[in-house]
Amino acid sequence: RVNTYRGPAQILREVSLRVGDGESVCLVGRNGAGKTTTIDSIMGLLPVRSGRVTFRDRDITRVPAHERALAGIGYAPEDCGIFPDLSVEENFQITSWIVPPRANARRGLDDRVFSVFPEVKGFMTRRGLHLSGGQKKMVAITRAMSLAPSILLLDEPFEGLAPVVVTRFIEAVRAIKAMGISVLIAESNLVNAARVCDRLYAIDRGEIIFQGNPRDVFGNEDVMRTIRG
């Protein structure tokens, strides 16, 4: 059960969740509910004040973020983290310098990584500032996949996308899951979450208020009201 602070303010209160092998799980809540803080706590971008973060039965609570990436935790942030003045290819290279890929990560890169978003191959030489919002998200997810993760953390991957593009991204998440990679998605839109996840957690004011089958949450008026704000 994790407690996390941003400065003096406690953001997460006794948060506990689990993602199984090959499972897609969504963390749903309105803006400011604690979704991004949860993702950042798992990735090691924010220190956990108390509680534990475990990965494959290993306590990684005090392990730096880059070591978590090396261990197999992939991460695509909400803002995508794309360097605007660098090409897409150079953005990939920067990642490999910061977090050297595991020995087998580059083997079959085209088959495994670009099969999710083959569109990325078409703009590898384009600079980040010339990418659309959807293209930036594609690059962020592909970049995370290039490190051969066992689990992928996606922070608001569908935000700001047109409905047809959301469907494309949901198909991509399903393809990632079909590779045996676990996925944890922070998502504000409950309908999108229900389309892609096996299980769902709802968070509000830093506390988990629901967990279970995504279909069940639609029958819970209190949770629905809270999520919608």
Residue ranges and their predicted role:
Residues M43:
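Helix-to-loop junction immediately C-terminal to a conserved catalytic motif
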Residues R127-L131:
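Conserved ABC ATPase signature
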Residues G51-D59, A71, A105-D110:
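Conserved ABC transporter NBD signature motif
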Residues V28-R30:
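The feature captures the beta-strand-to-loop junction immediately N-terminal to the Walker
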Residues L152-E156:
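Catalytic Walker B motif of ABC-type/P-loop ATPase nucleotide-binding domains
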Residues A144-M145:
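ABC ATPase C-loop
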